[in-house]
């Protein structure tokens, strides 16, 4: 009789441990997936194509077009990802979506300056220097949005970045009270870059 009781207790203990492990696994996987789904669903309605952003110029008067940094090459030129962001921002500027472009990127080291590369590229593509503003402390998406609101006093903007990044950028912008629209800059296949 005692052996059966010990086996029953051991079985219940094993079932409890397995149940707990499954619960923890569900929480560890489910909570981040749920949060990600919520961020995507809450920001997606404010995404626009380049054509929509240009057509909505009068309805949405943006203070600025914001380009988020994405790395530079060893020679100081924009990476392929950053180049696409800059090209889309240039097109939006030329469509008069906003009167200025804010380049926000990493310049935390004297030998690495995303923002200078971004501004140089935009100027070479015909954007007037007086309409380019540089945020040299955009070390993260959060930092960029914080500085847009608190340093550059942006109330409304069009954020340009790749779609995968746009959700987070839009979420952070809204968290700081910025009325933002997002335009994805997925012009290339980046799988080999």
Where are these regions (language model features)?
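A structural signal for short, hydrophobic/glycine-enriched beta-strand patches
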Residues: 35-193
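N-terminal type II signal-anchor transmembrane helix
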Residues: 2-52
């Amino acid at each position: 009789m005692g052996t059966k009781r010990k086996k029953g207790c051991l079985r219940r203990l094993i079932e409890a441990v397995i149940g707990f492990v499954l619960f923890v696994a569900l929480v560890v996987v489910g909570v981040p997936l749920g949060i990600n789904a919520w961020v995507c669903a809450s920001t997606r309605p404010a995404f626009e194509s380049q054509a929509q952003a240009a057509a909505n110029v009068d309805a949405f008067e943006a203070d600025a077009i914001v380009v988020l940094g994405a790395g530079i090459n060893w020679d100081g030129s924009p990476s392929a990802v950053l180049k696409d962001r800059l090209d889309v921002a240039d097109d939006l500027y030329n469509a008069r979506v906003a009167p200025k472009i804010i380049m926000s990127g990493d310049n935390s080291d004297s030998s690495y300056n995303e923002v200078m590369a971004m501004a140089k590229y935009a100027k070479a593509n015909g954007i007037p220097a007086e309409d380019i503003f540089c945020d040299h402390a955009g070390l993260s998406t959060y930092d960029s949005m914080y500085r847009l609101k608190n340093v550059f006093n942006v109330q409304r903007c069009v954020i340009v970045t790749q779609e995968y990044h746009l959700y987070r950028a839009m979420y952070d912008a809204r968290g700081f009270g910025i009325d933002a629209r997002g335009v994805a800059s997925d012009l290339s296949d980046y799988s080999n870059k």
